Amino acid sequence: YWQRLFAPNLKIHPEFVAFHQKNYGTASYQDFVQQFKAELFKPEDWARIFEEAGAKYVVLTSKHHEGFTLWPSAQSWNWNAVDVGPHRDLAGDLAKAVKARNLRMGFYYSLYEWFNPVYKSDVQRYVTERMLPQMKDLVTRYEPDVLWTDGEWDHPAKTWQSEAFLAWLFNESKVKDQIVVNDRWGNDTKGQHGSFRTSEYGQGAASNSQRPWEECRGMGESFGYNRNENLEMYQSGEQLVH
């Protein structure tokens, strides 16, 4: 939403601007955090449903491309779920509930951020002072079984310092003997490196791979709730599995 609303280089989706102005006036995207309370979030219920559905592991989006973190990241001061909005460690609460059910817990983490001024002006400073400390903090705090990175496409793995981070992860971190990672560590790594390959809405045909793979998609045509989607747009359970 923020990208379509704000990105000056994307001269598409003017309906986003019209919708926003009609419903929210001059409010900024950041103002939405005041409405984000998560008052109905019950991680124990989520974990129970995951288990009853037959899931073996859970991956939560800890930070997407807008940079907001669901844990109290020191590098995301005043733009995380503890400092503002719910005032709650959503990532930690879900991790605790999932592990209590003996399920594997994982985190999605976006390497890049759409409008972070440091990322836009000095990528290496962003990687060194924000991205790497955040990923190490996430791993050290919650000891996940899966680290699912994304947003790698702007730069090769060398720029993201992926090799150095993975060396730490698999040699020094608390989860070095148990964690698995996906293949999105640079625009030169997808399908080539990682514990498993990832495709997205069928792109890349990872199912043809001899290596472990995971298909990344929503149940419908969106990754989140979209009130414009009807039931016909949703995949059946059999379609999602096969």
Q: In which residue ranges do the predicted regions lie?
A:
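Mature catalytic domains of secreted/periplasmic carbohydrate-active enzymes
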Residues: 1-242
